[in-house]
A protein has these predicted regions:
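Conserved N-terminal phosphate-binding loop of PLP-dependent enzymes in the Aspartate aminotransferase
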Residues: 1-372
Length: 372
């Protein structure tokens, strides 16, 4: 594919591997080499590559209608909204195409609902690369070249309640948190910090938004990660694993949250696409207790077999290394295992939720050989 590289803007430092097919937890490149995928397209391929349920749902919808615009209803969009509402206590959904768009929607919703433009987010967080999402991303290396960004954004240290309270003001309308900071090193937020964030949001009249773009849809062993954390958010953002690799994002607004959007306040040409929503409903239906038991069991199996300090939850795990994570990623790939980095010295594992005990054993054997 290097011959085609001049036609593509260099926004990614792509590895010189071209994948041509996949099934379950496995990928195949154009030379016929098989790879065990423990990156899952960066926590996207929740049910594994070419899973028959979303595949059949998308194929069936392709034979009916592809696009109508959001001036009209489609059954797949309404059915997906209902499924997510059932999971999140009567929530209402806005659909878009990516996690960054879902974050943009959350920022706008909070501004309109509270009348306050300020946002508190976390140092080390990652919420997307559009201007609004980048404004609330706590990684200076990603922000600096594009400043000035949105005003009124303050960053607190993760799991530091005093820092959180110091960052907030009377103009704070949104507190935005990832239950596990994925790109920021797979750092879980503790329950005391989350409880303090929820209490602070109520005190300020702000909305609490949990960015579950990476942790949601069963990734940590429950459909939403917040279910394990004793907190009730006003807003939740989803994307990544919701449609098993087809482009989708969602903002979920709790039934108890104040009114924000009215017709004309926000929109998305392709949001709620019927083909993608049909696939996403199939994914939601597949995230049952049996699958969640597998997520928890395989996560514990990985933890037990990894040699270094491990953090995270379910099948979103970070392994602290004593050398370059990028080098370990390369060495694992050369040995037939796809993994991810999350910072300079953290290895990130996010395999499909359907991964088997035998596949975890194989991944562990490769990791142990690479790490020594």
């Amino acid at each position: 594919m290097k011959t085609l590289a001049p036609a593509v803007l260099p926004t990614y430092a792509r590895t010189d591997v071209t994948f041509v097919s996949g099934e379950g937890c496995w990928l195949v490149d154009d030379a016929g080499q098989r790879y065990l995928d423990f990156g899952g397209g960066i926590a996207v391929v929740s049910l594994g590559h070419c899973h028959p349920a979303p595949l059949a749902a998308a194929q069936a919808q392709l034979e009916r209608v592809w696009h109508t615009s959001n001036l009209y209803w489609t059954t797949p969009m309404a059915e997906l909204a209902e499924r997510l509402s059932e999971r999140f206590g009567g929530a209402r959904a806005f659909f878009c195409n990516s996690g960054a768009e879902a974050i943009e929607a959350a920022i706008k919703y909070a501004r309109k609902a509270t009348g306050k433009p300020g946002v508190v987010a976390l140092e080390g967080s990652f919420h997307g690369r559009t201007v609004g999402a980048l404004s609330v991303t706590g990684q200076p290396a990603k922000r600096t070249a594009f400043e000035p960004l949105l005003d009124g954004v303050a960053f607190a240290r993760p799991n530091d309640v005093e820092s959180l309270r110091a960052a907030a003001t009377a103009e704070t309308g949104l507190i935005l948190l990832e239950p596990i900071l994925g790109e920021g090193g797979v750092v879980p937020l503790d329950t005391a910090f989350l409880a303090a964030a929820e209490a602070l949001s109520r005190e300020l009249g702000a909305l609490l938004c949990l960015d579950e773009i990476q942790t949601g849809v069963g990734r940590t062993g429950t459909f939403f990660a917040y279910e394990q954390l004793g907190v009730e958010p006003d807003l939740v953002t989803l994307a990544k694993g919701l449609a098993n690799g087809l482009p989708i994002g969602a903002l979920l607004v709790a039934d108890s949250a104040p009114e924000g959007f009215a017709p004309g306040d926000h929109g998305s040409t392709f949001g709620g696409n019927p083909v993608v929503c049909a696939a996403a409903s199939a994914v939601c239906d597949a995230i049952d207790e049996e699958l969640l038991v597998n997520v928890r069991a395989r996560g514990e199996q990985l933890r037990a077999g990894l040699p270094n300090k491990v953090r995270g939850g379910g099948l979103l795990l970070g392994l602290e290394l004593y050398r370059s994570a990028a080098e370990v990623v390369d060495e694992c790939r050369e040995s037939g295992l796809i993994v991810l980095s999350a910072g300079e010295t953290v290895l990130r594992l996010a395999p499909p939720l359907t991964v088997t005990e035998a596949e975890v054993d194989l991944a562990l054997s490769i990791l142990q050989e690479v790490l020594g």
